Amino acid sequence: MEISYGRALYRNFLGQSPDWYKLCLLGFLILNPLVFWVSPFTAGWLLVIEFIFTLAMALKCYPLLPGGLLAVEALFIGMTSAEHVREEVANNLAVVLLLIFMVAGIYFMKQLLLLIFTRLLLGIRSKTLLSLAFCFAAAFLSAFLDALTVVAVVISVAVGFYGIYHRVASNRDEGQELVDDAQLDDERRATLERFRAFLRSLMMHAGVGTALGGVMTMVGEPQNLIIAHAAGWSFGDFLLRVAPVSVPVFICGIVTCILVEKTKSFGYGEPLPEPVRKILREYDDKSRQKRTRQDTMKLIIQGLIGVWLITALALHLAEVGLIGLSVIILASSLCGVTDEHAIGKAFTEALPFTALLTVFFAVVAVIIDQHLFAPIIAYVLEASPHNQLSLFYLFNGLLSSISDNVFVGTVYINEAKSALQQGVIDAKQFEMLAVAINTGTNLPSVATPNGQAAFLFLLTSALAPLIRLSYGRMVWMALPYTIVLTLVGLACVQFTLVPFTDWLLQSGWVSTPATTALLH
């Protein structure tokens, strides 16, 4: 007997998502207009919490769907306007271009990346040393490249590793789905679970590494550039100003990496299973034997394009996304990828996340229009100058954990500059606050995927369901790093930032510009 149209509509709504999840979302959609009618401020915070919930349930349903429904309703009931959302997207066009083109560009270099990281995996048998290598490499690259680019590279490599083992273990062709484990026997399934744990730990070490390196330089994160511009700092000024906080935090982050691996706590410590190592080694040997001069030339070209990529990004020759587009053009042209469908595969990873990020901008527009952060900012500016540093750091960290850290950093640096213009603080205090804001948005935000765009990209990537990396598991695995980075950062902001900056000023390494210079 055929079901009714109403039942069919309900089954189609969010597809295979659990019934309880569908009912929750329907409840949100009914509740929000009612709360907005009573209190727009409360409704705004409710929307933020609901959006975080959809991110937390990313493995139940891709957040674009439920989050998008909530955002569309927010527009309809007047929590924000379509024009404001357009402005937010326009303001973040560089990030959108980055996601569309840079992530796709990395796809065309995956042969070289897989070769390099396969040698790295097979060459370093110690899991602790391997974790350090991933964490340090991610930190170094993120100091000069964008964190999303770095994470995209590591994701591409991890999917490659997973695919090699899964296809061999399940006796399937390259085109088969990687999510289906039905063909695996119990022994191979157990090995696969250990391999998943191994990949999860490497991905988290690399993800945290992007935060450790990204905080150090003005090009490491988008909000760093905004803060540096507001304070009138050059690349060297920024590096030195942030060093009293960023260097101790980096050292403690590396120590944390070693400790969690040695103690095998918080989901870390799983070594590469020997059956997987054997398969990867056999794959590497076969690839080497089958490699023709044409294949070798492709690897050489990809290596040269990699040099171009790093050089162009380090020298800021163009917007990151446009550099990514040049990578696509060069790699596809010189490696002979001419079919439209083959080129189209490069974009399948990034476009859903780009759409999700646009929905996120709609939520940011609601946060601005409903003045959700206004009470917190007012409270912080009422504190004494010395306490302002730690309060700015803590509230930046708290809000960056639940919201976009680019948005939070922008809001706080604008408020600090407004206080400078009104004579509430002087130029020196403004520069101290700029460091507190920068470190506050970058360090504690590793607590959840919401704060770090790179973490959110990892959570919603094709890799996450393969290695069983859920929102809750990411929060749990990030917890030791969150505690260490937050507390060490807070201690440095409170105790070492001011004296070390005074020493830099006295030594002539940096200088405080006149207040009038900062106001322009």
Curated annotation (Swiss-Prot):
Transmembrane recorded as keyword: yes
Domain of life according to the entry: Bacteria
The gene coding this protein: nhaB
UniProt topology in membrane: Multi-pass membrane protein
Keywords for the protein's UniProt record, in alphabetical order: Antiport, Cell inner membrane, Cell membrane, Ion transport, Membrane, Sodium, Sodium transport, Transmembrane, Transmembrane helix, Transport
Family: Belongs to the NhaB Na(+)/H(+) (TC 2.A.34) antiporter family.
Primary site of residence: membrane
Function: Na(+)/H(+) antiporter that extrudes sodium in exchange for external protons.
Protein name, UniProt field: Na(+)/H(+) antiporter NhaB
GO cellular component: plasma membrane
Species assigned in the record: Cronobacter sakazakii (strain ATCC BAA-894) (Enterobacter sakazakii)
Phylogenetic classification of the source organism: Bacteria, Pseudomonadati, Pseudomonadota, Gammaproteobacteria, Enterobacterales
Annotated GO MF terms: sodium:proton antiporter activity
TM segment ranges: 27-49, 62-82, 97-117, 120-140, 144-164, 202-222, 238-258, 303-323, 348-368, 391-411, 447-467, 475-495
